[in-house]
């Protein structure tokens, strides 16, 4: 149903957001360590 497809959509978006946030944190940390930011 509509609710199920919305749940699937929200799950996918959440995963992408978490992935993006993790990558942002990692790149920020690595540039701070390398003093390149």
From Swiss-Prot:
Tissue: Expressed by the skin glands.
Source taxon at top rank: Eukaryota
Keyword terms, alphabetized: Amphibian defense peptide, Antibiotic, Antimicrobial, Disulfide bond, Secreted
Disulfide linkage: 31-37
GO cellular component: extracellular region
UniProt-annotated location(s): Secreted
Record flagged with keyword Transferase: no
Similarity-based family: Belongs to the frog skin active peptide (FSAP) family. Brevinin subfamily.
Function: Has antibacterial activity against Gram-positive bacteria.
The protein's name: Rugosin-C
């Amino acid at each position: 149903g509509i609710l199920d497809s919305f749940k699937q959509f929200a799950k996918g978006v959440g995963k992408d957001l978490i992935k993006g946030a993790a990558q942002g944190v990692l790149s920020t940390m690595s540039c701070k360590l390398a003093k390149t930011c």
